[in-house]
């Protein structure tokens, strides 16, 4: 059997961070906790301020569902996660959120990549978008930018935005 102590410590640290964040945010206004699995179904209000408490992937995933609302990325465990998209610690939430609420914190705009199929379907990504077959086969595709296009054949293409190029 394996040793699960580290997983238990990680979970305990995360649960403590959630509790502290809820306390801090609750003193500043209404709080609605949305789990990652419910994000695709949640409708954010135009005036909502969103706090993502987790790893970088949670920030990138959450951004896909926002339409101009500010998002504050919070690192629940700085000793464990580098958090390129998590500039704040839970202990910094109070002053950071007060700045955000009064509009005193600069916002960083995020560009998204969008892929459109000839079937009319589209897919957006905040960091990286893989375009290709699920299997190891080769695909034929056309890459276009403005009025210029090129035909290609390969196993696929990875398109990275500014967030996707963080490493």
What are these regions (language model features)?
Residues 52-54, 74, 161:
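Short His-Asn-centered micro-motif
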Residues 1-49, 53, 87-107, 122:
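ATP/NTP phosphate-donor binding region
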Residues 57-63, 165-167:
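Short glycine/serine/threonine-rich phosphate/pyrophosphate-binding segments
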Residues 50, 71, 157-158:
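Short, well-ordered beta-strand core segments
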Residues 77-156:
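Catalytic core of DAGKc-family lipid kinases
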Residues 156-167:
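Conserved mixed alpha/beta catalytic, RNA-binding, or beta-rich assembly cores of soluble enzyme
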Residues 36-38, 76-79:
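Short, ordered loop/turn segments at secondary-structure junctions
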Residues 61-76:
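Gly/Ser-rich helix-loop-strand patches that form or flank binding pockets
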